[in-house]
Regions:
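Hydrophobic transmembrane alpha-helices of secondary-active transporters
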Residues: 61, 65-66, 70-94, 306-326, ...
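Predominantly late transmembrane helices and immediately cytosolic-facing juxtamembrane segments
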Residues: 2-10, 14-20, 53, 206, ...
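Structural signature of hydrophobic alpha-helical transmembrane segments
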Residues: 69-81, 129-143, 184-197, 235, ...
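Entry/N-cap segments of selected transmembrane alpha helices
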Residues: 92-118, 188-197, 324-346, 372, ...
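Hydrophobic core segments of alpha-helical transmembrane domains in multi-pass membrane transport
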Residues: 27-40, 80-86, 116-118, 198-203, ...
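C-terminal ends of transmembrane helices
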Residues: 12-15, 83-98, 146-157, 200-211, ...
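Functional cores that coordinate and move charged inorganic groups
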Residues: 149-261
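Transmembrane alpha-helix boundary signature
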Residues: 38-50, 66-69, 83-98, 116-135
Length: 438
C-alpha cells in the first residue's frame, strides 16, 4: 500500500483524534513548564498547599469530598481513562486492532516497549524500597508523542503516525492491566461484588441497546464509587464503563430523512442571513445526524476536547511541579537512572528488538511504507512517558516515599524531554537522508 492509499485509509475519527491529541500535547508541555516555574518560585508554598485543599461539602458530621489533588487524580483522570477505554474499544472493533493481522505488529511492539523499560528499572532497583516503581517507565504519553510527530509534518510517513497511535493505544491497555495487577492493595471483596453487580446491570443495558447515555453515566458514578472503595484504583471503573457503552448505530430511516432535509435546504432561497425555515431545517439535520451516531461516538466526541484541553493540562500542572533544591535526594536508590534509562533506552530497544525478531520468525509483518529506521524513531518517541508515567508514580510511591516520588517526577520530565528531542532530530535526519538519496 503506497503512502496516498494509507493516508486515504485514515478514518475521519482518527484524523480528528490525531489533531486534538497533538495540539493537546503542546498545551500539556506548556502547563508542565509552568508548573516547574511556579514550583521553584516565590509562589511555591501556595502552589503545593493548593493541591491539599479539601473540596467537597459537609453533611452533618461527615465531609464528602477529597483534596483538590485527589479530585484531579481520582475523579477527573477517571474521565480521561473513560475516553481511553472508548478509544481502545473502537480500535478493537473497527480500527487497527480489529484483526490479528492488523493488531499483531503494534501490540507486540507495545509489549516490548513495556517489558524492556520495566526490566531495566527493576534490575537497577531490585531489593530496594523503590522497586515497586517498575511500572513508571513502561507508559507512553500519546498526546506528547503525537505532538512531536505532528510538528514534523510530512517528513514523517502517515503509516508511521498510524503505527504510533496504535502502539500507544495498545500501550494504554497494557498500562491499565499493570495498574490493576500491581498497584492494587487491601482489596475489599464486598465492594468488588457491588461493582460486579453494577457491571451486570450495565451489560444488560448494552444488550438491550439502550442508546441514552444518561443511565450508563449514572451507573458509572456508582461503579466508580464501588471500585474506589474496593481498593482498586477508580480509573479502572472508567475503562470497564467504556466497554459497556453501545457502539451499534440505529437501523432506521434517519439517513433517508437527512437526504430529504438536505434537498429541502438546497431548494430554499439563499440570502445574507438564514431564513427561519433554513434554521429549522439545519436544526433538524443536526438532531438527526446526532441520532445516527452511536453512543460510543457521541461520548468520545464530547470527552476528547475536555480531556485534551482541560483534564490532562490540569493534571500536568498539578503533578509536574517539583521544587528542585538541595533538600531533594537524587540518589534515592536508582530511581533517577532507572526511569531515564527505561524511557530513553528501554522503550526504543524493546520496541525495535521484539518487532524485528517477531517479523523474522514470521509472527508479524511490518506495515508497508515504513522502514526499520522508522520503527526505531517511533520507539524513541514512545519514550515520552510524561503524564501516564507520572500517574503511575503517584500510585507506586505513597507519602512515605516522598523523596522517591519527587525524584521519579524529575526523571520522567528529563527522560521524556530527552526522548522527544532525540526522536524528533532522528526522524528529521532520516527524512533529510532519504531526500538526499533521491
Amino acid at each position: 500500500m503506497n503512502l496516498k492509499k494509507t493516508e486515504n485509509a485514515l478514518s475521519l475519527t482518527l484524523k480528528n483524534f490525531i489533531k486534538s491529541e497533538s495540539f493537546g500535547g503542546i498545551f500539556l508541555f506548556l502547563n508542565a513548564v509552568l508548573a516547574m516555574v511556579v514550583a521553584n518560585s516565590f509562589l511555591k508554598e501556595g502552589y503545593f498547599a493548593l493541591w491539599h485543599t479539601p473540596f467537597g461539602f459537609q453533611v452533618g458530621d461527615f465531609f464528602i469530598g477529597f483534596s483538590l489533588h485527589n479530585w484531579i487524580d481520582d475523579v477527573l483522570m477517571a474521565l480521561f481513562f473513560l475516553m481511553i477505554g472508548l478509544e481502545i474499544k473502537r480500535e478493537l472493533l473497527f480500527g487497527e486492532l480489529s484483526s490479528f493481522k492488523k493488531a499483531s505488529f503494534p501490540v507486540i511492539a507495545a509489549l516490548g516497549g513495556m517489558i524492556a523499560p520495566g526490566l531495566i528499572y527493576f534490575f537497577l532497583n531490585a531489593n530496594t524500597p523503590s522497586q515497586h516503581g517498575f511500572g513508571i517507565p513502561m507508559a507512553t504519553d500519546i498526546a506528547f508523542a503525537l505532538g512531536v510527530i505532528m510538528l514534523l509534518g510530512k517528513r514523517v510517513p502517515t503509516a508511521l503516525k498510524v503505527f504510533l497511535i496504535t502502539l500507544a493505544v495498545a500501550d494504554d491497555l497494557g498500562a491499565i492491566v499493570v495498574i490493576a495487577l500491581f498497584y492494587t492493595t487491601n482489596l475489599k471483596f464486598a465492594w468488588l461484588l457491588g461493582a460486579l453487580g453494577v457491571v451486570l446491570v450495565l451489560a444488560v443495558l448494552n444488550r438491550l441497546n439502550i442508546r441514552s447515555l444518561i443511565p450508563y453515566l449514572l451507573l458509572g458514578v456508582l461503579l466508580w464509587f464501588c471500585v474506589h472503595q474496593s481498593g482498586i484504583h477508580a480509573t479502572i471503573a472508567a475503562v470497564v464503563l467504556a466497554f459497556m457503552i453501545p457502539v451499534k448505530i440505529p437501523k432506521d430511516s434517519k439517513n433517508v430523512e437527512l437526504l430529504e432535509l438536505g434537498k429541502r435546504y438546497a431548494e430554499t432561497s439563499s440570502g445574507a442571513l438564514l431564513t427561519k425555515e433554513q434554521q429549522e431545517i439545519l436544526h433538524s439535520i443536526e438532531e438527526k445526524a446526532s441520532a445516527l451516531q452511536s453512543p460510543l461516538e457521541r461520548l468520545e466526541h464530547f470527552l476528547a476536547p475536555i480531556s485534551g484541553y482541560f483534564i490532562m493540562p490540569l493534571f500536568a500542572f498539578a503533578n509536574a511541579g517539583v521544587s528542585v533544591d538541595s533538600s531533594i535526594n537524587l540518589e534515592v536508590d536508582k530511581v533517577l537512572l532507572g526511569v531515564i534509562l527505561g524511557l530513553c533506552l528501554g522503550k526504543p530497544l524493546g520496541i525495535f528488538l521484539i518487532t524485528f525478531i517477531s517479523e523474522k520468525l514470521k509472527i508479524t509483518a511490518r506495515p508497508k511504507g515504513i522502514s526499520w529506521w522508522h520503527i526505531l524513531g517511533a520507539g524513541l518517541l514512545a519514550g515520552i512517558g510524561f503524564t501516564m508515567s507520572m500517574f503511575i508514580s503517584n500510585l507506586a510511591f505513597t507519602s512515605e516515599h516522598k523523596d522517591a516520588m519527587e525524584v521519579a517526577k524529575i526523571a520522567i520530565l528529563l527522560g521524556s524531554l530527552i526522548s522527544g528531542i532525540i526522536g524528533a532530530l532522528y526522524l528529521f535526519a532520516l527524512d533529510k537522508r532519504a531526500a538526499l538519496k533521491k
